[in-house]
Swiss-Prot record:
Keyword Protein transport (UniProt): yes
GO annotation, cellular component aspect: cytoplasm
SUBUNIT field: Homotetramer, a dimer of dimers. One homotetramer interacts with 1 SecA dimer.
Membership in a protein family: Belongs to the SecB family.
The name this protein goes by in its record: Protein-export protein SecB
Described purpose of this protein according to its UniProt entry: One of the proteins required for the normal export of preproteins out of the cell cytoplasm. It is a molecular chaperone that binds to a subset of precursor proteins, maintaining them in a translocation-competent state. It also specifically binds to its receptor SecA.
Major location (coarse): cytoplasm
GO MF, any single term: unfolded protein binding
Keyword Cytoplasm: yes
């Protein structure tokens, strides 16, 4: 029989995911059914991503929100536009405050992104298109780019 030392485990730095949820979801399919018949070529996809971090009232609890917008077009039609706000509530336990920003900007978004990606893929497929499979995102590179822009 093994004994688990809960005191040692509680002192270890870690991130706890308390909740994940859709805050807002919108899909527009403005030219259906004409646009569905016009899918001869792969559409152009314009993708934007933003991350919002909110310090909740409780100590070390944060909401990290991914705002993703994808617009697909071809020569004739705006095929679809999908907007998703997907968030998670994270508790940063035994983590130094100077590490919070990078964890909330890189690790937490990376933890919830696969769920947001799946929602977008399902929505676009349900709209009659091929599922939009967003490529993995390097949140670390985005964070470092944003930090270097703020320094300049």
């Amino acid at each position: 029989m093994s004994t688990i030392n809960t005191d040692a485990n509680e002192a270890m730095p870690h991130i706890s995911v308390n909740a994940q949820y859709i805050k807002d979801l919108s899909l527009e399919n403005p030219d259906a059914p004409s646009s569905l018949a016009a899918l001869e070529h792969r559409p152009q996809i314009d993708l934007s991503l933003d991350i919002n971090i909110t310090n909740l009232s409780e100590e070390n609890f944060y909401e990290v929100e991914l705002n993703i917008e994808a617009v697909a077009r071809n020569e004739k039609y705006k095929l679809f536009q999908v907007e998703l706000k997907y968030a998670g509530v994270f508790n940063l336990i035994n983590i130094a405050p100077e590490q919070h920003q990078i964890l909330l900007s890189v690790h937490c978004p990376a933890m919830i992104f696969p769920f947001a990606r799946k929602i977008i893929a399902s929505c676009t497929q349900d709209a009659g298109f091929q599922p939009l499979m967003i490529d993995p995102i390097d949140f670390g590179a985005l964070y470092h780019k944003k930090m270097s822009e703020h320094q300049n």
